[in-house]
Design a protein with these regions (language model features):
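Major-groove DNA-recognition helix of helix-turn-helix-type DNA-binding domains
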Residues: 18-67
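Polyanion-binding surface elements
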Residues: 4-19
Length: 67
């Protein structure tokens, strides 16, 4: 069984949304502020899905393909 990655990185946001990696970094900062997280804490796929409105299944399918 292959384990799916739990964290989202700017490059993932770039591939999922088609936007720039810089946009991905900015969005991660916004998500951290939204969930009141510290700069050293990771953003999970569930948090990204909730914030962006993208279905979690789409995100998990992408993460399975790239893992």
């Amino acid at each position: 069984m292959k384990i799916t990655r739990a964290c989202i990185y700017p490059k993932d946001i770039q591939c999922i949304t088609g936007r720039s990696e810089r946009y991905g970094r900015r969005l991660i900062k916004e998500i951290r502020a939204y969930f009141d997280k510290q700069p050293h804490q990771f953003i999970t796929s569930e948090e990204f899905a909730e914030y962006s409105g993208i279905n979690i299944e789409i995100i998990n399918n992408y993460l399975k393909q790239v893992s």
